[in-house]
Regions:
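Active-site neighborhoods and metal-handling regions in enzymes and metal-associated proteins
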Residues: 1-393
Length: 393
């Protein structure tokens, strides 16, 4: 693989903004106000980043009247004519895909939004709101007070639809992220040996991620024993926080996700600590079978629900209840968790160029199996891009 990272061109960012503006106009909107969160979080930065290549690094702090407002949040004001202004609370790092005159840098982010809305003639009428789910209520109330003649219909669907199908350069970035994620999880699985703590395992992964310029998003980690006296060892915060050393006879799983150049990797693996037992292998293999059954259904024209039902049918046939923490079989992936959701009820039609994560965690009698892969949807099926070792038994 080339040492040079793939990237998105300024022309592609401009085309994304053009499409978003056109969709806003088609919905009868004057434009869009797009809000994203930064400040070290990795779960809802994608909408503004998708359109501008900008991420704010400043952490969240409560508003202080006259001094600062809406810190850790970035806003893009985009008119239906295609003009835009980015309002940021951290300096441009020379990667932003906008001209300098189209960026307002200020501690008083809400005042900057007001200035941008007036500059683009959007201080009255219907302006679609994107990212309302990450905007604090007090921020929305303040905006509503500053712009009393604006109506804010939900326009999240515009960015959901744009981000669902990836461009060739996005797919290249997701391939690179998957390579880094695969290398990290293989290092972690190798470190998962008797005597190691969950933290030791994460340290092995970070030794791969940090030099690659990657950020760890989640490392959902658990170990335990099945049988008459089942035991599960895990922590909610951090998700790898257990200090209890791994021991022979335990099962072990990692659900690992992270970000490379803005794009996510997401994968899961399981193994036995010490020699595997038949019961452990049964769960590990069942998780793989369920995921593979869902992957076999992926091709353009089928629905997300159809893919989910294929995996769930295999799970039922194997005798495992659907009682995990996530009832779906997976999701799109890009600058976050994207559409579609591989779940019953999602009628989204699968298209070539989507990138999907397919996942399953199953439990029985105290044993656990966990497996997740990432695929690119092709013209006639899909291609796996995860690349990590699958079986450790």
């Amino acid at each position: 693989m080339s040492s040079q990272s793939p990237s998105i061109s300024s022309e592609e960012f401009a085309e994304r903004r053009r499409c978003a503006a056109e969709m806003a106009g088609a919905d009868g909107l004057k434009g869009l106000l797009i809000c994203s969160r930064g400040g070290g979080t990795l779960d809802r930065f994608g909408d503004v980043f998708y359109l501008t290549n900008y991420y704010t690094s400043f952490p969240y702090i409560p508003d202080l009247a006259g001094a600062w407002s809406a810190r850790a949040h970035t806003f893009l004001v985009l008119s239906a004519k295609g003009d835009c202004v980015l309002v940021t609370d951290a300096p441009n790092d020379n990667h932003t895909a906008l001209a300098e005159e189209d960026v307002i840098y200020t501690d008083l982010v809400l005042d900057g939004v007001l200035e941008a809305m007036r500059r683009l003639g959007m201080e009255t009428g219907k302006v679609g709101l994107v990212g309302g789910d990450v905007m604090p209520v007090n921020t929305y109330q303040a905006l509503d007070g500053l712009l009393p003649e604006v109506v804010w219909p939900n326009a999240q669907h515009i960015l959901v639809n744009l981000r669902a199908v990836k461009s060739p350069d996005e797919i290249a970035l997701l391939r690179r992220a998957s390579v880094v994620g695969a290398q990290a999880i293989e290092a972690m699985m190798a470190a998962a040996e008797p005597g190691s703590s969950h933290g030791d395992v994460v340290a092995a992964g970070m030794a791969v991620l940090a030099p690659a310029g990657a950020s760890l998003y989640n490392s959902f980690m658990a170990s335990g024993r099945g049988g008459e006296n089942p035991q599960v060892v895990r922590r909610n915060f951090p998700t790898w926080g257990s200090k209890e050393p791994l021991a022979d006879g335990q099962w072990f799983r990692i659900g690992l996700s992270g970000v490379v150049d803005g794009y996510y990797f997401d994968l899961s693996r399981s193994k036995a600590i010490g020699p595997p037992t038949n019961q452990q292998i049964e769960l590990f293999e069942a998780a793989i079978e369920i995921v593979e059954a869902a992957i076999a259904e992926i091709r353009p024209g089928v629905t997300a629900e159809t893919v989910a039902q294929a995996g769930l049918a295999k799970q039922t046939a194997l005798g495992y209840p659907n009682d995990g923490v996530f009832s779906g079989l997976g999701h799109g992936v890009g600058l976050g968790w994207d559409a579609p959701w591989l779940a019953v009820g999602d009628q989204t039609v699968i298209e070539s160029g989507m990138v999907l994560c397919i996942e399953r965690t199953i439990r029985k009698n105290g044993y656990l199996g966990d497996f997740e892969e990432t695929v690119v949807v092709t013209e006639d099926g899909c291609e796996k891009i995860t690349g990590a070792q699958i079986r450790y038994w």
